[in-house]
Amino acid sequence: MIFMLYEFYGEECPHCQKMLKLTEKLMKEFPDVKIIRKEVWHNKENMALVKECDKDDACGGLPFYYNTETKKWLCGEVKYSELKEWSGAK
């Protein structure tokens, strides 16, 4: 099973830059995990998509991760173990 995940980020966001290293590690370690990166601060379409995924503005910040399979999300800078568990990677 391939897990499709969205990673919403801001180009100038320092937390997003830190998390990029972890998402790259996750994709290398688990080839069945596909992360689609969407920059939102400079792209209106991506901003609309993050608002659709972050219903009720529950996170309201970046980075924001959305699992298209489970419909669950993850907000902010987290540890690798939490990212891995949330992603469904095995």
Question: Model-found features: residue ranges?
Answer:
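Local sequence-structure signature of Cys/Sec-based thiol-disulfide redox active-site neighborhoods
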Residues: 1-35
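Solvent-exposed loop/turn segments at secondary-structure junctions
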Residues: 11-13, 42-43, 71-73
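Disulfide-bonded cysteines in secreted/extracellular proteins and peptides
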Residues: 13-16, 53, 59, 75
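Residue-level recognition of beta-strand->loop/alpha-helix junctions
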Residues: 37-41
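A short acidic, often aromatic-flanked loop/helix-cap motif at beta-alpha or helix-coil junctions
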Residues: 42-46, 80-83
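Short Fe-S-cluster ligation motifs
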Residues: 43-60
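Non-catalytic, surface beta->alpha helical segment in thiol-disulfide oxidoreductase systems
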Residues: 61, 66-90
